[in-house]
A protein has these predicted regions:
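Intrinsic-disorder/low-complexity coil detector
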Residues: 6-10, 16, 44, 80, ...
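Acidic, metal-coordinating catalytic segment for phosphate/diphosphate chemistry
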Residues: 2-31
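Conserved Nudix-box catalytic region and its N-terminal flanking loop in Nudix hydrolases
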Residues: 2, 29-95, 118-130
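Nudix hydrolase/Nudix homology domain
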Residues: 46-58, 90-183
Length: 183
């Protein structure tokens, strides 16, 4: 029991100076969520892509959880989610883009002038070097990465496997990257 007369104990760890002394400011990166909505039509993956943008981007309020914002976004389009999963991030035009794949039930219809049904094309993965990201990352490359990620999750994560049984034949075509060399 301490009497208060003892000298202060030596610190367990000596902390260095702060990494940054800049509070939030316009010089810091902002973030946005990219919601890549996929569904199945005629046993093939289809991307529900915004008609007037390269991808669906929404803001991320400081108090919100990203997955909840994605679910709210899907609700605005009256889409029924089956799987929502963060898949990647990238730095783009002064902001961090956090990408989520959202697999939804095939919609009977879509609100006019919002989302277009676009067949999913295969793409080479974006490659950087050992200490730097790729110089450019396209949305189709993000979708390719996401589908390879789902290919692994559908086998490894029971919740994903149960949610996407009809996607298994499609996802077999997308070999997870960490395991390509082992095949």
């Amino acid at each position: 029991m301490s009497t208060g007369d003892e000298p202060p104990a030596e610190p367990v760890v000596e902390l260095g100076p702060p990494i940054s002394e800049v509070a939030w400011s316009p010089e810091l990166s902002t973030q946005s969520l990219e919601v890549l909505i996929l569904t199945l039509e005629d046993a093939e993956p289809v991307w529900l892509k915004p008609e007037h943008a390269d991808s669906l981007r929404v803001g991320l309020p400081a108090t919100a959880r990203p997955g909840d914002v994605v679910l709210d976004t899907l609700g605005r389009y009256t889409l029924t989610p089956r799987v929502v999963h963060s898949t990647s991030w990238r730095h783009e035009e002064g902001r961090v883009v956090l990408s989520y794949i959202a697999v939804v039930e095939p919609p009977s219809g879509l609100p006019e002038d919002t989302l277009a049904r676009t067949p999913v094309a295969r793409a080479d993965l974006a490659r950087g070097d050992a200490t730097a990201p790729p110089p450019e990352i396209g949305v189709l490359q993000v979708i390719e990465h996401a589908l390879r990620h789902l290919s692994w999750l559908v086998q490894d994560d029971p919740a994903i496997g149960e949610a996407l049984p009809d996607w298994r034949p499609i996802l077999e075509r997308y070999q997870p990257e960490p395991f390509r060399a082992l095949g």
